[in-house]
C-alpha cells in the first residue's frame, strides 16, 4: 500500500480551489421543529387547498363530453360509408380528376356465411355504391337562365350507363314530377300525333331563349320552362308529326344530340296532368304562346257546359240519331263516338259503363219514331220528304226515254203509277216482266231506293215473319218472282194484293191488322199468260220490258236511273200523279216545326 501522505499525482489533483469535495453539514437544519416554525411565505405555500368544496354542474359537463364523443363517432361513420357528394358539389372538376385508374371492386364467389355481420356490411356497402355518381350543377338555377358550362352536363350524361333513366331522374329532380306521369308512351317512332311533350337536357341559354320564338311558326300552342339543366316543352303542332320529325326539328333548332331528348305525347284525359300545364304557365319562369288546347281547357277551365258534361242525356242521343237517320246500332255507336270532341253529351256517354245498353235502346226508339212518323204521313208528304233529301239535280227525261225504249205507252204507265201510289184496290200491284238483262231490277231498285222502300226476299218464306217489312214502309219490292213464289202468292196473298186488310204476323207482337203498301214485282214470267194464276190477273198490272238494257261504248248505262232523275221526275209530274200540294196539307195558321224527342228545357243556353 502506498502512503497517503506521499507526494504523488492523484485523480483529485487540481480541484481544490473551485470545486467542493465534501458537503458541509449543519446541525440547525436537522431540527424539524425549527423548520416548521419558520416563515411559511414561499412559492408552494398554497399547494394544498383546505377550503370547502362546492358540487357545481358536473352533470352538464358529462353530457357535453358524451355529445362530443358521439359526434366524433358519427363523423367517422359518415366518412366511412357515405358518398363524397358534398365534396363533389364544391368542386366537380377537381373530383373528376384522377391520377390513377379506378379498379373495379371484386366480389367473392363463395362468401362465408357465418354470423352474418360481415355479409351485412358488404351489402350495405354495395347498396351505397351507385350514389358515388357526381350530379351536374344546374346552369339555370331558380327558373332563371345562367351561363354555366354545359360541358359538365355532357360529361355526366356520357358517364351514365342508362341515359334514358338518367334523364328521367334529372327531370324528376328538376320539376318534382315524373316524366311518365305527364305523358303516355308511343312505342313506334312512326306514330303521328299533334301534341308532344319534349324534355331536353343541357341546352345552351341563347338557343333556349330563341326557341320560344322559332317554334311559334310550327305550333298553335307552346309551353316552355327551364329549371336547371332540364328544359321542358309542350308543343301543339299545326299538323301531326311523328317522333322522328319532332327530334329532327329540336336537334336542328337547339343544336343538341338526340340522346339528350325525351319525347312522348301528353296524357289527354288526366286531370292532374292538365293542371300541371295549366298552373305551370301562371308562374314567372314559364313561357306560353297561343290559346289553351281543348284537352287542357275542358279539364281545367269552368264554363256553362261543365254541369252538363257530367251527366248523360239519353233523349239528346235519340234526337241526334233521329235527325241523322241512323237506325243500326253499329252506325249509332261509331258516329256518336266520333262526335265526342264536339259534344259534351257524347263525352258523358263514352264515360258511362252502359254504352251498349244505351245504343240498343237508342236504335229501338229511333225505329219507333220513324215508324210513327211514316204512318202519320200521306203518300204525297212521304214522296215530297224523300225527294227533298236528294242532293243534286237530274233530268226526268231519262226515265221517260227508258220507258218508251221498252215500247211502253208513257201515258198508260203514268196512269198505272198514279193508281199504284195511291193504293187503289185492284191497282195496288205492278209487275215488270221480260227476258233477263232488260233492266227490270235496275228500274225497280232505283224507284225503291229514292222512296226509301223495303225489299222482300222469298228465300225467307219458311219464316212466318218474312212479310214483316211490309208494316214498316210506304212502298215495297219483291224481286225476281219465280213459280214457287207465284204459287205462294196465289195461295195466301190474294187479299193483300187486292188492297184489303189482312192479318200480318210480326215478331214479338200480336198479329197486326193492316193493308199492304204498293207492291212492285219483277219476274221473267208473264203471269197474265199463265192460266194457273188466273185469279191474280185482275189484281196485278203488268208491263213488259222486251229490249236489253242499252249501254254506252265506255260500258256505262245510256239511261241514268238515278235518285236525281227520279227527283226531277216526281217534281215535273207532281200534278199528273195527283199528289197533293204540301202547303195545303196542314191546317191554316199551323206552324211547321221539326220533330223534337229530347227533354230540352226552354231556358237553356243557345
From Swiss-Prot:
- Disulfide pattern: none
Which SUPFAM superfamilies does the record associate with it? Origin of replication-binding domain, RBD-like (SSF55464), P-loop containing nucleoside triphosphate hydrolases (SSF52540)
Q: Where does ATP bind?
A: 434-441
Residue spans of biased composition, Polar residues class: 593-606
Is Lyase given among the entry's keywords? no
Q: List, alphabetically, the Gene3D superfamilies matched.
A: 3.40.1310.10, P-loop containing nucleotide triphosphate hydrolases, Zinc finger, large T-antigen D1 domain
Q: Which UniProt keywords apply?
A: ATP-binding, DNA replication, DNA-binding, Early protein, Helicase, Host nucleus, Hydrolase, Isomerase, Isopeptide bond, Nucleotide-binding, Phosphoprotein, Ubl conjugation
Q: One Gene Ontology cellular component annotation? A: host cell nucleus
Q: Where in the cell is it found?
A: Host nucleus
The segment annotated DNA-binding region runs over 146-309
Q: Where is this motif: Nuclear export signal?
A: 90-99
Which GO terms of the molecular function aspect are on file?
Answer: ATP binding; ATP hydrolysis activity; DNA binding; DNA helicase activity
Indicate which residues form the motif Nuclear localization signal. 78-80
Q: Which family, according to UniProt? A: Belongs to the papillomaviridae E1 protein family.
This protein's name: Replication protein E1
Source organism: Human papillomavirus 5
